[in-house]
Structures are given as C-alpha cells and as structure tokens.
Amino acid sequence: MRKLIIEPLTKEAFAPFGDVIETDGSDHFMINNGSTMRFHRLAEVQTAQPDDKAIISIFRAEALPMPLTIGMLERHPQGSQAFIPLLGNPFLIVVAPVGDAPESELTRAFVSNGRQGVNYHRGVWHHPVLTIEKRDDFLVVDRSGEGNNCDEHYFAESQLLVLDPNPLEG
C-alpha cells in the first residue's frame, strides 16, 4: 500500500481539483459603508442542469480511526461540492483527478489549516469528509436536482492507500 504524503493546502497545489476557500491572499472590497470586508467569489457552484439548485447543508462528521486505509473515493458528476469548516479545526482532504475512475497513483492528500475550505469541482474524485477532531461541523454547498450525483469507486487491493496524519503532530 502506498502511504499518502499529506501536503499543506494551497490554492496552487489544489487547483487541479477545485478551489481553496480562504480569505488569506484573496481579493476583497469594502461594503456596508466601510464596516465590512467582502471576499468576493472565492469559488463557483457548478451544476449540470438548468433546474438544479445550489443548496446549503451542515455535515457533522465523526473522526475515523487513523491510520486510515483509503479504499474508496466518490465523485459528484452533476455538480461541485464545497466544505467550509465551522469550528476552525484542521481537516484532511484526499483527491484524485477527474476521469472515468480515480487513479491510485495520482491520488493526493492535503490538510486544511482550519480557516480554509475546499470546493471540489464537478467530477473530481475525493474521499468523504475527514475530520481530525473527534467531531466536527462543516457548512456544505452542493447541488440538488434530478439524477444520480454520487458515484463511488472501490480500489482493488493492490491500489489501496494509507493516510496517517500522525506526522503532523511531530
């Protein structure tokens, strides 16, 4: 099994998979008579059909035991999906490029600093939300509409990956 190297989450490194949602280094302008700084258009919600709706949900995630064997990734072919941490905790991100199936050797792992969210572009393979904390809440922006919007791919045993965040503690 290949051990995933956990990279810091940056806009440049994550660009092939989607958007990093953060205020650091982002364009902004003042609104509300100068009392509010608006960080505008940090990501775009992607939908496939004219009748699709962008919806907002909250996911409450439970931590999985680590190290974690990554045996499955999912994708949303009908729309993007964004995760914004609500409690300020770092979280893990596992992604693979758009394609008919995720390629184990192209799969990458990132860690958010807790002030960064991610917006997976339509069709990007990713692991379901991975909190480091025992329990964590995320604001989720994704698509509601007709048709299947979640494909799952299970890796063959020879393609399994290992995610171990413990080096972050040292």
From Swiss-Prot:
Catalyzes the catabolism of the allantoin degradation intermediate (S)-ureidoglycolate, generating urea and glyoxylate. Involved in the utilization of allantoin as nitrogen source. Homodimer. This is Ureidoglycolate lyase. GO terms for molecular function: ureidoglycolate hydrolase activity; ureidoglycolate lyase activity. NCBIfam families: PRK03606.1-2 (NF002949), PRK13395.1 (NF009932). Keywords: Lyase, Purine metabolism. Its EC number is 4.3.2.3. GO terms for biological process: allantoin catabolic process; purine nucleobase catabolic process. Belongs to the ureidoglycolate lyase family. Pathway: Nitrogen metabolism; (S)-allantoin degradation. It comes from Pseudomonas savastanoi pv. phaseolicola (strain 1448A / Race 6) (Pseudomonas syringae pv. phaseolicola (strain 1448A / Race 6)). It catalyses: (S)-ureidoglycolate = urea + glyoxylate. Its cofactor is Ni(2+). It is an enzyme of class 4 (lyase).
